[in-house]
Amino acid sequence: MKLQHVVYLVAIFFVVAIFVIACIEENKYLVWIMIILANTTNILSLVRSISYIKNIRKHQKDTKIQRQLFFEKNGGGMLIERLSGAGSSNIDFKIFTEEDMKEATNGYDVSRILGQGGQWTVYKGILPDNSIVAIKKTRLGDNNQVEQFINEVLVLSQINHRNVVKLLGCCLETEVPLLVYEFITGGSLFDHLHGSMFVSSLTWEHRLEIAIEVAGAIAYLHSGASIPIIHRDIKTENILLDENLTAKVADFGASKLKPMDKEQLTTMVQGTLGYLDPEYYTTWLLNEKSDVYSFGVVLMELISGQKALCFERPETSKHLVSYFVLATKENRLHEIIDDQVLNEENQREIHEAARVAVECTRLKGEERPRMIEVAAELETLRAKTTKHNWLDQYPEENVHLLGSNIVSAQGHTSSRGYDNNKNVARFDIEAGR
């Protein structure tokens, strides 16, 4: 107990005691002493109140100073300057206060935690307008990375693609920066394929659509963003699905901006085992083809329903890529295709998708296709699937509406149709801007 509290209690005791004695003895001197002590008690109460208010104001001042220091350390001044220079009126991006984040997460309550990793924690946040967001608490490696962090925040804030999780804003008044993203309700693709909470009901049509959406999003990052972005950690855990199973590429914590005048970057290896480009792993040279490799692994997961890396599987099949490629070469792909999706009608489409996956995971990056080419091939595959389904349903309309010169005897579209679908894929990428 503090000294001022002790003095206060003692004073009250003496006032009460003297009052009792004065009443008994009818001593006017004691009454005066009581009055003096009572006033002293009031003065002590006043001093105590003033001290309390002073401490509150000091704490508020210290907190304000601390927030300002964090804001500057995390690059707040630089961000405001860059936003002004970029024309912030065209960027839908908000800088939140620490108080905003505390209220949104109910004081960072553990019940609000959506997920955790070695470098981050994601909270569910509710903003004053009742909109739900995902708040990611991350950390900077050192102060030398501040400018790079701000650059990436600026670039990501300008991405407005329907298949990329939208960065809504950030908070820099905390010890570590907080990033605020749109909230996606349906869990990750990993959850749907492998998680115990989901009984996977993803049909082949769903999986192909997800692959097309993810491929289009990555192609946009590589070719459509103001500065090419290499995601560097494409995996099923970083692909979120909304209530309509629309795919959203998420988690840009490992992403790198690639200057227009550079073919590749020399950087410390970062990524996830099972999805990590072996060429990047051995050379430390990063370019867009590393994302192509990772996407190929995701496509293999969609086809097989198996994890990218699983030590519970036999030695020959621990790594999905090597297992998948070998099965393809030995013409036994049917052994690893997910039983939930394979049927007589979609065998050709699944095998075509498997071929694309194998091409994406070639050891040499130069032998892999670009993501814009992958997106175009998958779009073409969907067009073929749609056309086959339509022809099966309305065979009598084939000659009248399509013309015999458009569809071959095997049901494949002509080269003209392929080019048209490439244009569709390019249009989708452009439309994401």
Swiss-Prot record:
Reactions it catalyzes: L-seryl-[protein] + ATP = O-phospho-L-seryl-[protein] + ADP + H(+); L-threonyl-[protein] + ATP = O-phospho-L-threonyl-[protein] + ADP + H(+)
Residue list for modification Phosphothreonine: T97, T267, T272
Chain ranges on the Cytoplasmic side, renumbered to this chain: 51-433
Enzyme Commission designation: 2.7.11.-
Family: Belongs to the protein kinase superfamily. Ser/Thr protein kinase family.
Subcellular location: Membrane
Name by which UniProt lists this protein: Putative wall-associated receptor kinase-like 16
Membrane topology: Single-pass type I membrane protein
GO molecular function terms noted in the UniProt entry: ATP binding; protein serine kinase activity; protein serine/threonine kinase activity
Modified sites of kind Phosphotyrosine: Y181, Y280
Residues that bind ATP: L114, G115, Q116, G117, G118, Q119, W120, T121, V122, K136
Domain Protein kinase: 108-391
Any one biological process term the GO annotation gives: cell surface receptor signaling pathway
CDD domains in alphabetical order: STKc_IRAK (cd14066)
Record-linked PROSITE patterns: PROTEIN_KINASE_DOM, PROTEIN_KINASE_ST
UniProt keywords, alphabetically: ATP-binding, Kinase, Membrane, Nucleotide-binding, Phosphoprotein, Serine/threonine-protein kinase, Signal, Transferase, Transmembrane, Transmembrane helix
Active-site annotation: D233
Organism: Arabidopsis thaliana
Major site of localization recorded for this protein: membrane
TM helices/strands, residue ranges: 30-50
Regions of this protein lying in the Extracellular compartment: 23-29
Keyword Cytoplasm tagged: no
Function: Putative serine/threonine-protein kinase that may function as a signaling receptor of extracellular matrix component.
UniProt signal peptide: 1-22
Any single Gene Ontology cellular-component annotation: membrane
